[in-house]
């Protein structure tokens, strides 16, 4: 009985490779020093699931799946190019200018017997084309036009709302406090209202991207004249540098960039090494908004914006900055009502109905723009 068993054991031993392993390769893999157990994007989703499920309740599953799905874009027409022919080409794609559609709708309401919408005090001359609800078509990449400038700029169409809300008027002096990568700066220039525009960002690499956008879309005489100034200063100190200077200020602050954080590992604020930076974001945001308000002339307006869903970075920051200016500078600031934006742009965006102050575009599979929070503030004389 023992002999057959021994023969089987010998056969098995012949099949097994007992080649010795060099000592330097014999180690136990340690995840902490090799690949992270959780990627930054996974940590972001984990964080959002914990916080936003409480903040948004039953809406969170819908927002979540939309954030994880492909984003929609709008095409901001370059008014410095042959904008009329560009608009015609975009219309041939069955896209519509959502800004002009909203304004036309507002003008028709009194004739239809509906209650009139408050006057849309928005920045003029902006043309941004989007595909209709549920249409997931994509715009072709922008091309160099006949005038040597790019035809249109692809962006999250919700990013145009803070610029519209700023309500620029001809001859305004304007500050874009956190300007890079440049989409909103370009939109500000498209209005044709800026007598002077200061575009600032602390990061020199990001202002380099901003300069490239301006070079591709804006004529040389405007770029190199006195109309546009690009700087890389600490935005928190702007109230000291140029206090009481600007008619309108856009404060599009650094934030958790929720959609980006779920899709990109590079430069993700949910990296473990950036935990302290992430925790300090609300304080930085309050400081930047306060600086923007101090840089505004008495009677001027500021729009605060983020691409985050977090009320800690949105409503709470607005309230914190208002209290800071009242207590430390004896400056009164009033939040302006933008609820009519929800009515005017409801065909293009999905708005969260329960913001304490300001407006919030939430991602929705039918209209997958955002997130984008924006709030308009009036520095009282």
From Swiss-Prot:
GO molecular function: mRNA (cytidine-5-)-methyltransferase activity; small ribosomal subunit rRNA binding
GO cellular component, one term: mitochondrial large ribosomal subunit
Segment annotated as transit peptide: 1-25
One BP annotation, GO: positive regulation of mitochondrial translation
Domain of life from the UniProt record: Eukaryota
One Pfam family, short name: Methyltr_RsmB-F
Catalytic activity: a cytidine in rRNA + S-adenosyl-L-methionine = a 5-methylcytidine in rRNA + S-adenosyl-L-homocysteine + H(+); a cytidine in mRNA + S-adenosyl-L-methionine = a 5-methylcytidine in mRNA + S-adenosyl-L-homocysteine + H(+)
Gene null: resulting phenotype: Embryonic lethal.
Subcellular location: Mitochondrion
Residues modified as Phosphoserine: 203
EC numbers: 2.1.1.-
Signal peptide region: none
Cited InterPro entries: MeTrfase_RsmB-F_NOP2_cat, MeTrfase_RsmB-F_NOP2_dom, RCMT, SAM-dependent_MTases_sf
Family that this chain belongs to: Belongs to the class I-like SAM-binding methyltransferase superfamily. RsmB/NOP family.
Quaternary structure and interacting proteins, as annotated: Heterodimer with MTERFD2/MTERF4; this interaction seems to be required for NSUN4 recruitment to the mitochondrial large ribosomal subunit.
Name under which the protein is recorded: 5-cytosine rRNA methyltransferase NSUN4
Species: Mus musculus (Mouse)
């Amino acid at each position: 009985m023992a002999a057959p068993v021994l023969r089987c054991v010998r056969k098995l031993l012949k099949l097994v490779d007992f080649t010795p392993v060099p000592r330097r390769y014999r180690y136990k893999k340690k995840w902490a020093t090799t690949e992270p157990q959780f990627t930054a994007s996974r940590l972001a989703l984990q964080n959002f699931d914990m916080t936003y499920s409480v903040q948004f309740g039953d809406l969170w599953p819908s927002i979540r799946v939309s954030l994880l799905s492909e984003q929609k874009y709008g095409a901001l027409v370059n008014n410095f190019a042959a904008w009329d022919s560009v608009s015609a080409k975009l219309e041939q794609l069955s896209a519509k200018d959502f800004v002009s559609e909203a304004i036309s709708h507002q003008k028709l309401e009194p004739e239809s017997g509906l209650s009139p919408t408050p006057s849309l005090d928005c920045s003029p001359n902006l043309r941004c084309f989007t595909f209709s609800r549920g249409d997931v078509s994509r715009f072709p990449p922008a091309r160099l036009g006949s005038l040597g400038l790019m035809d249109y700029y692809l962006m999250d169409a919700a990013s145009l709302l803070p610029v519209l809300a700023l309500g620029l008027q001809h001859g305004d002096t304007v500050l874009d406090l956190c300007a890079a990568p440049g989409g909103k700066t370009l939109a500000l220039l498209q209005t044709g209202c800026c007598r002077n525009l200061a575009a600032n960002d602390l990061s020199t690499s990001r202002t380099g991207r901003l300069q490239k956008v301006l070079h591709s879309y804006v004529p040389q005489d405007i770029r190199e004249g006195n109309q546009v100034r690009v700087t890389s200063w600490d935005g928190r100190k702007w109230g000291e540098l140029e206090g009481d200077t600007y008619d309108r200020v856009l404060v599009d602050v650094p934030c958790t960039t929720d959609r980006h954080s779920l899709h990109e590992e590079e430069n993700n604020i949910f990296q473990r090494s950036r935990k302290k930076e992430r925790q300090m974001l609300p304080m930085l945001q309050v400081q930047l908004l306060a600086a923007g308000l101090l840089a505004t002339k008495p009677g001027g307006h500021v729009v605060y914006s983020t691409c985050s869903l977090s009320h800690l970075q949105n409503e709470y920051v607005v309230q914190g900055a208002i209290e800071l200016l009242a207590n430390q500078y004896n400056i009164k600031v009033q939040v302006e009502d933008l609820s009519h934006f929800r009515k005017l742009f409801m065909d293009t965006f999905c708005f969260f109905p329960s913001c304490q102050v300001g407006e919030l575009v939430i991602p929705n599979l039918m209209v997958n723009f955002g997130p984008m929070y924006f709030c308009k503030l009036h520095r009282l004389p």
